[in-house]
Amino acid sequence: MKSYFYDNESDVISLDYLKEHNVLYFPMDREKENYKEPLETLCKERGYKNRDEVKLSKETPGLEDKLKIFFEEHLHDDEEIRFILDGCGFFDIRDKNDKWVKIKEKKGDLIIVPANMYHRFALDESRNIHAMRLFTDAPKWVPINRY
């Protein structure tokens, strides 16, 4: 995981800065099966009872339309939890000063974006991601667009 201000990739942001904004990061070792126990512990501690998986690639029908929806600035009533099983993508979040922070997630990264935080999502140039989504209740994804 790497985070930086949207317009300056060399201005790296610390995990502490993300924590100040209630964005949480958990590295998971996807190269081994070792990630399963810490993942289950996290789910139990935070009350994540449900999950599903999403795969997007260049071959996904309607990919560009889906990506347009994900890239619209929005928030959710619930946390947005993503565990990247393969591929790479970017969460852009708004910090307390309304500045965009870009968070690059890759295989093995788990991020929790808090409820009611404006954000958006994009794929990297490979256009490939396989992510596990975690939920406290039934799996749902309801965006509340900013504009």
Swiss-Prot record:
EC number: 1.13.11.54, 1.13.11.53
Record text on cofactor binding: Binds either 1 Fe or Ni cation per monomer. Iron-binding promotes an acireductone dioxygenase reaction producing 2-keto-4-methylthiobutyrate, while nickel-binding promotes an acireductone dioxygenase reaction producing 3-(methylsulfanyl)propanoate.
Record InterPro entries: ARD (IPR004313), ARD_euk (IPR027496), RmlC-like_jellyroll (IPR014710), RmlC_Cupin_sf (IPR011051)
Residues involved in Ni(2+) binding: H74, H76, E80, H119
HAMAP family: Salvage_MtnD_euk
Keywords, sorted A to Z: Amino-acid biosynthesis, Cytoplasm, Dioxygenase, Iron, Metal-binding, Methionine biosynthesis, Nickel, Nucleus, Oxidoreductase
Protein name: Acireductone dioxygenase
Broad class of where this protein is predominantly found: cytoplasm
The keyword Isomerase appears for this protein: no
Protein's job: Catalyzes 2 different reactions between oxygen and the acireductone 1,2-dihydroxy-3-keto-5-methylthiopentene (DHK-MTPene) depending upon the metal bound in the active site. Fe-containing acireductone dioxygenase (Fe-ARD) produces formate and 2-keto-4-methylthiobutyrate (KMTB), the alpha-ketoacid precursor of methionine in the methionine recycle pathway. Ni-containing acireductone dioxygenase (Ni-ARD) produces methylthiopropionate, carbon monoxide and formate, and does not lie on the methionine recycle pathway.
Transmembrane keyword on record: no
Residues that hold Fe(2+) according to the record: H74, H76, E80, H119
GO molecular function: acireductone dioxygenase (Ni2+-requiring) activity; acireductone dioxygenase [iron(II)-requiring] activity; iron ion binding; nickel cation binding; oxidoreductase activity
Biological processes annotated in GO: L-methionine salvage from methylthioadenosine; methionine metabolic process
Catalytic activity from the UniProt record: 1,2-dihydroxy-5-(methylsulfanyl)pent-1-en-3-one + O2 = 4-methylsulfanyl-2-oxobutanoate + formate + 2 H(+); 1,2-dihydroxy-5-(methylsulfanyl)pent-1-en-3-one + O2 = 3-(methylsulfanyl)propanoate + CO + formate + 2 H(+)
GO cellular component: cytoplasm; nucleus
Metabolic or biological pathway: Amino-acid biosynthesis; L-methionine biosynthesis via salvage pathway; L-methionine from S-methyl-5-thio-alpha-D-ribose 1-phosphate: step 5/6
